[in-house]
Swiss-Prot record:
Component of the AMPAR complex. As a component of the AMPAR complex, modifies AMPA receptor (AMPAR) gating. Its main location: membrane. The keyword Membrane applies. The keyword Transmembrane helix applies. Residues 30-125, 188-209 are extracellular. Pfam families: GSG-1. GO terms for cellular component: plasma membrane; synapse. It comes from the Eukaryota. It comes from Xenopus tropicalis. Keywords: Cell membrane, Membrane, Synapse, Transmembrane, Transmembrane helix. The lineage of its organism: Eukaryota, Metazoa, Chordata, Craniata, Vertebrata. It is found in: Cell membrane; Synapse. The chain crosses the membrane at residues 9-29, 126-146, 167-187, 210-230. This is Germ cell-specific gene 1-like protein.
């Protein structure tokens, strides 16, 4: 089932709106990557083996009072031992991270740190470049959406709408390319941070989160909208060229002595007169045998034009009538 030009424009607007919504949601959320951190438990934190926890002084002659201070807390100058082995001595903290924050959840509490500060100094420039690219991606996507809406709801003629359609397609393609580059740069920075970031942050395991999925879904919808818009423009231009060849052929068959400038003027007059009254001039007369009526009785201002009474040309593709 072939969609009409107006339906294709509406579909492009919807796809662009979805892409814009998903890109904003992904950029300002911190669920691009999720996983767990493996950290050593504080001394005597284990409820199961707390009875085996001992604090021994550095000096073998130290008494039990040396292991604790006056407040009853463990003395930081004392070596602390616990008898937990394997994974019993580690705590696994869930974390999620995005462009702006990396948050850890442990025992019902969540603590967040700036991901920009966590990234290595060598990667901060790339990270800021990815942030700027994401901003440009959203801005260009918004501009493309506004142009598509203008082309869809505008009451201007068909030719002006076609120009807006072409510009919207170019803007949307550029935004999609910027978004793809931004996503890839961020993931590169994240993987470097996993290996070279702070030791207390490096994840034990990690996987892609729903923000990452939204970002690439936004890119897919963006490129789909741009391809659909560009397809509408290209299809219309090819139809223009084909119909113009048929038009010029029929005009020359009916009047072989007509000046080429006159033929070009007749074509432009026909296109603009039709596009100002109908949405799609090519749906106005389907088929090769449809007549094309052009009034040239008022043409007197072109060089070499012959001033005559009002007359018309009824041209058909088979060349039998003129």
């Amino acid at each position: 089932m072939e969609l009409s030009r107006r339906n294709r424009s509406l579909l492009s607007v919807v796809l662009n709106l979805l892409a814009l919504s998903f890109s904003v949601a992904a950029f300002f959320t911190s669920y691009w990557c999720e996983g767990t951190h493996k950290v050593v438990k504080p001394p005597c934190l284990s409820a199961v083996k707390s009875k085996n926890c001992q604090a021994l002084a550095l000096n073998s002659s130290s008494t039990g009072s040396d292991a604790t201070d006056t407040n009853g807390t463990l003395n930081p100058n004392v070596v602390h031992y616990n008898w937990e082995t394997g994974d019993d001595k580690y705590a696994f903290k869930y974390f999620h991270t995005g462009f702006w924050f990396s948050c850890e959840k442990h025992q019902g509490e969540e603590a967040c740190r700036s991901f920009i500060e966590l990234s290595p100094d060598s990667e901060k420039g790339v990270l800021w470049l990815s942030v700027i690219s994401e901003f440009l991606y959203i801005i260009l996507l918004s501009l493309g959406f506004l142009l598509m809406c203008l082309e869809f709801f505008s009451s201007s003629n068909f030719i002006d709408g076609l120009k807006i359609n072409a510009f919207a397609a170019i803007i949307t393609v550029l935004s999609g390319l910027l978004g793809m580059v931004a996503h890839m740069m961020y993931m590169t920075v994240f993987q470097v941070t996993v290996n070279l970031g702070p030791k207390d942050w490096r994840p034990q395991t990690w996987y892609y989160g729903w923000s990452f999925g939204l970002a690439w879904l936004s890119f897919t919808l963006c490129m789909s909208a741009s391809v659909l818009t560009l397809n509408t423009y290209t299809k219309t231009i090819l139809e223009f060229k084909y119909r113009r060849r048929i038009f010029e052929k029929n005009v020359r068959e009916c009047n072989p002595f007509l000046d080429p400038e006159m033929v070009r003027f007749l074509w432009e007059k026909y296109i603009f007169s039709v596009s100002s009254t109908v949405e799609d001039p090519f749906n106005w007369h389907k088929g090769f045998g449809s007549p094309i009526f052009v009034d040239i009785g008022s043409i007197t201002d072109l060089p070499g034009a012959v001033k005559e009474e009002e007359r018309g040309m009824d041209l058909e593709d088979d060349g039998d009538q003129c």
